[in-house]
């Protein structure tokens, strides 16, 4: 995403993005990286001599959707977690019609009391162990005997290009009795874990790529943003962003867990949902929003977050990634104290703030990383006890793998998307400048 490589970014616009076909445009890059691996004669100005310069590609920096295009592993559905792979644990919520990624008790010690508590979690006793991160050798083993053809659908003589575009955009309509099943293909057969591999990544042409421990980074910037928006949307009960609701409570009924949160049916047959530990009253929401609206920060510390506050509806909208970064780590733990939420929710928010603070610190203490991993596992398990299953999107689950990536790749400042987004600003400016000059 540097200035010299902006042309590569310009070929991936809009809904007709390259997707898995991006390997076609990455081929020149791979050829150069292979050449650097073998060695390139380079002149040393200090010694006045030539030497063979060698270089290797450590990893890729990308957001989560782009990881699917570079890796080839689909980041949606049952096995959406690229680290867990076939060992991912998830299930489909029938009423909410979405996937739930729980099962974090597997990372707890074998005799921890949470493993035996059915009713407080997903209704099962957890006996499994934490899965190992899927290696490059495992991925290549799953690709054996498979052939993939890159390229878009070519229109036939009877079908124009316009018809193909309309067909690709048109969505299939479901009948009222048809249910979405994330684990079945178009033929109705049960999907296998290896079906989540959509291609053989072009990076495996590099002789060392199979043995790299960390190949594609999980983007801490967007994961932190998604987690923060889950909390804000659920606590403030923002329409379209909250993870709680009638369907979420009906999923608890189907799972047979946490009867105190099940919907209540009155004498007229109307359903209402009881207050949960994370439910806030109108007065509490107003206090929280007023604290954020009246907040004043040092120059350069954060943007004007007060512009995102709507006091009439008690909502927060239009937050940028860095706004969520500051909110989750520094503002939200303090602001929530003023509106007196439940102790369980307050504890979770403080633990998450401390987790991301230590994770994003410039200096990493290796002796503290094991404790940090234990703390995020306990926090995720406490979240499973309090929040509804629909809260646990794949971004929430991926937090359990972030400490391991710090051990392998070092501080997140060298591996997240903030620098890339800043480089992209130049591209957006040039694009709009050219657009305006066309009509002036």
Give the residues covered by each predicted segment:
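Boundary/linker elements of alpha-helical solenoid repeat scaffolds
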Residues: 313-314
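Plant-skewed but cross-kingdom recognition/interaction modules and surfaces
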Residues: 335-336
């Amino acid at each position: 995403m540097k200035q010299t490589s902006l042309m590569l970014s310009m070929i991936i616009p809009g809904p007709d993005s390259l997707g898995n076909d991006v390997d076609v445009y990455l081929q020149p890059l791979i050829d150069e990286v292979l050449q650097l691996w073998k060695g390139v004669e380079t002149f040393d100005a200090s010694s006045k001599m030539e030497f063979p310069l060698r270089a290797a590609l450590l990893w890729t920096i990308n957001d989560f959707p782009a990881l699917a295009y570079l890796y080839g592993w689909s980041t949606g559905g049952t096995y959406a977690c690229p680290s867990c792979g076939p060992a991912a644990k998830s299930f489909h919520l029938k009423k909410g019609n979405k996937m739930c990624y729980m099962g974090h008790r597997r990372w707890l010690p074998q005799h921890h009391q949470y493993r035996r508590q059915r009713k407080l979690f997903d209704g099962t006793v957890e006996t499994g162990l934490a899965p190992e991160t899927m290696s490059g050798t495992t991925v290549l083993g799953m690709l054996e005997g498979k052939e993939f053809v890159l390229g878009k659908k070519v229109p036939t003589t009877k079908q124009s290009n316009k018809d193909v575009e309309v067909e690709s955009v048109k969505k299939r309509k479901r009948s009222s009795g048809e249910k979405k099943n994330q684990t079945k293909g178009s033929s109705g057969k049960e999907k296998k874990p290896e079906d989540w591999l959509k291609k053989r990544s072009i990076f495996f042409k590099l002789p060392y790529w199979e043995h790299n421990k960390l190949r594609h980074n999980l983007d801490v910037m967007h994961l932190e943003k998604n987690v923060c928006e889950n909390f804000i949307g659920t606590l403030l009960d923002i329409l379209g962003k909250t993870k709680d609701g009638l369907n979420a409570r009906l999923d608890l009924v189907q799972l047979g867990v946490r009867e105190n949160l099940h919907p209540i049916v009155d004498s007229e047959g109307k359903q209402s949902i009881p207050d949960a530990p994370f439910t806030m009253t109108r007065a509490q929401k107003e206090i929280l929003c007023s604290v954020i609206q009246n907040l004043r920060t040092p120059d350069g510390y954060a943007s004007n977050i007060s512009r995102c506050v709507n006091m009439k509806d008690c909502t927060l909208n239009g937050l940028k990634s860095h706004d969520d970064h500051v909110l989750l780590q520094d503002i939200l733990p303090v602001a929530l104290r003023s509106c007196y939420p439940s102790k369980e929710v307050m504890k979770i928010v403080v633990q998450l703030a401390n987790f991301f603070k230590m994770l994003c610190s410039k200096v990493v203490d290796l002796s503290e990383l094991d404790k940090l991993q234990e703390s995020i596992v306990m926090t995720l398990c406490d979240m499973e006890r309090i929040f509804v299953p629909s809260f646990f999107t794949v971004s929430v689950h991926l937090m359990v793998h972030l400490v391991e990536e710090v051990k392998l790749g070092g501080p997140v400042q060298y591996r997240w998307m903030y620098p890339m987004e800043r480089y992209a600003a130049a591209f957006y400016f040039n694009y709009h400048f050219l657009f305006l000059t066309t009509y002036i």
